[in-house]
Structure formats: C-alpha cells, structure tokens
A protein has these predicted regions:
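Short, conserved secondary-structure segments in the cores of folded domains
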Residues: 56, 235-236
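Calcium-coordinating acidic loop motifs
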Residues: 59-61, 117-118
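Glycine-aliphatic tripeptides that mark coil-to-beta-strand junctions in extracellular
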Residues: 64-68, 122-123
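Surface-exposed loop/turn elements that mediate protein-protein interactions on large endomembrane-trafficking
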Residues: 14-26, 30-40, 85-98, 139-155, ...
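SH3/SH3-like beta-barrel superfamily modules
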Residues: 236-294
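Short alpha-helix capping/helix-loop boundary micro-motifs
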Residues: 229-234
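Sequence/structural signature of beta-propeller modules
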Residues: 9, 17-45, 199-219, 279-294
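Short aromatic loop motif centered on NTY/YTY
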Residues: 2-5, 105-225
C-alpha cells in the first residue's frame, strides 16, 4: 500500500488454525532500513484488504489518531447473514439501515473487503458479499470518524488474483450473453469513491483467466468479420458455415459480443433483444438457441 507492506502467513506457520489469519505490517516510516526506496510507493492513495472480523487502524480525519475499523455478520448455521455490521470508531452501522437505497443490504454467505484511501484524504470501504449461485455484490461506503455513508452498489466482484490499487484494479461482472460467464474491466477509484473505467468492452478471455467460453454454430451465419487488432465495425459481412468454432472475447454487456475464429480473425455478434413474449434474443432474426450446438 502507500504506507508499507503487509505480509500474510499461511495457517500453522506462526500459530494454530484457531488463531485466525496471521499478518505482519511493515511501515515505510517505521522501518525505512528494511525496504529500498525504489520499492516504496509514497502515494496518498492506497488500498488494504480487510477480512470479516479483522480490525484495522486508520486515521480517518487526519488528526494523527487512528480509528478502529472492522465489519462482522450474524451468520446462521448455513453461514448466511441478512446484513453486515460495519464498526467504525466505536460506532456500529448495520447495512440493513441502507435498505431504502440498497435493497440487497449486504446479505450473503461470505464477505470480503478493502479499505481504500483516495487523493482527497477520504476513506472508503469496498465490501463484497457473495449470495445465491455465487453471485457477487459490491457495496461502497464512505467511512468518517462519526458516521458511515452508503455511496453505491452493483453486481460486481473484486478479482482476488489481481493486485488492488486505487489507480488500477480489476472488477468482474456476470453476464448471460451467448453463455453465462464473468467478464472483466480495469477500473480506478474516483475521488467520490466510485470506480470508473475507460474500457468500452468487458473482457471475457484475457490474462486474468485461462477459462474460455466456446461456441459451435449449428447453422450458416452471416456475421461481420475483421482482422485481429482492427477496430470494431471495420470488417465485412461474411457467411460462416455451420460447424464454425468461436471463442468469445469481449462484450458490451448488453447486445454485442466479439469472438475469435480458428484462423485468428474476429467476428462480431449483434444481438436483437427478446420481445415481451420471448426469453432469449436473436441473431439475424434467429433465436440464439437455434444458432449454436449445446
């Protein structure tokens, strides 16, 4: 983070399982001789992970005194909780109190989060919960010395395999466009605490995962096809025969998807939204389920 390095140890390395997660934090200021200058970030922006029931100390108002931050949940025998309780500077805030603006209210089977500091000195809690069907839900709160403010929420997930830096991090979202999958975009945190992206499309297949969404057509399909590394819309219409193999690459999350062909070219799917009487969209007037082998 901008303040130092935190080392997390596997279970049983320092203590028994019952002792919980073991971690050691090394501050750049307190231990300048341990960390070379070129590896010190020295940024006013930072993000640190915070697990359920873990306590972190953060100076929320810049007065030099650190406030205690944590969150907890009253879980049933199936590990399900109706809401999350955020503990901030001795006060407790149940996410159920934000139900008017956040219907989901933080319920789920698990929770994980990050404390995020932005350039303007404000501190945010990025709280992710996982509900039915492993659906991820990201809620953002502003943490203040005497208050917690709900900012926004969306069906997004923090990629645990990628570093979380306020200037660049990865969020995922589940889609049902030509298949069911998670796709990713790179984001940064704005000064209002809300993640913003410059990416126009969500990435389905990338360096973030080896998993692929593959399709094989069951009918001849007329699609726009272009060379790799060229702009969307720059291709030509081409009839691809039944049996063509596609690997999905990107989507706009609504009615557009890109796939790579076996010869390396890119084809574009423009989807027609279903009517009120239909449950699925169409491609060139044909129901999606009739376009591919399943």
């Amino acid at each position: 983070s901008g303040d130092g390095i935190t080392v997390y140890f596997n279970t049983y390395v320092l203590a028994p399982y019952a002792s919980g997660e073991q971690a050691v934090s090394l501050s750049f200021i307190e231990y300048p001789e341990l960390i070379r200058k070129q590896y010190q970030k020295h940024s006013d922006q930072w993000a640190i992970p915070i697990a359920e029931d873990e306590m972190c100390l953060v100076d929320l108002d810049g007065d030099g005194a650190e406030e205690e931050i944590s969150y907890s949940a009253d879980r049933d025998e199936y590990d399900y909780a109706d809401s999350i309780v955020i503990h901030c500077d001795g006060n407790s805030y149940d996410t159920a109190m934000f139900m008017d603006s956040d219907y989901y209210g933080g319920c789920g089977y698990s929770a994980s989060g990050y404390l995020v500091r932005t350039q303007n000195g404000k501190t945010w809690l990025y709280l992710e919960t996982m509900g039915e069907g492993d659906g991820k839900y990201l809620q953002i709160f502003e943490l203040m010395k005497n208050d917690v403010r709900f900012v926004t929420a969306d069906y997004l997930g923090i990629d645990p395999n990628q570093p979380f830096d306020p200037e660049s991090f990865v969020l995922s979202k589940r889609f049902d466009i030509l298949g069911t999958y998670e796709a990713y975009k790179k984001f940064h945190v704005e000064e209002d605490g809300i993640p913003k992206t410059e990416d126009l499309l969500w990435t389905i297949v990338s360096t973030y995962t080896d998993w692929k969404v593959e399709l094989t057509s069951s009918i001849d399909m007329e699609l726009s096809v272009r060379e790799a590394n060229t702009k969307r819309g720059s291709g030509q219409k081409e009839t691809l025969p039944a049996g063509t193999h596609f690997v999905l690459l990107k989507t706009d999350g609504e009615a557009y998807a890109e796939a790579i062909l076996d010869d390396g070219r890119i084809c574009e799917f423009e989807l027609e939204h279903p009517s009120e009487e239909e449950w699925e969209g169409r491609i060139n007037g044909v129901s999606i389920s009739d376009c591919f082998e399943y």
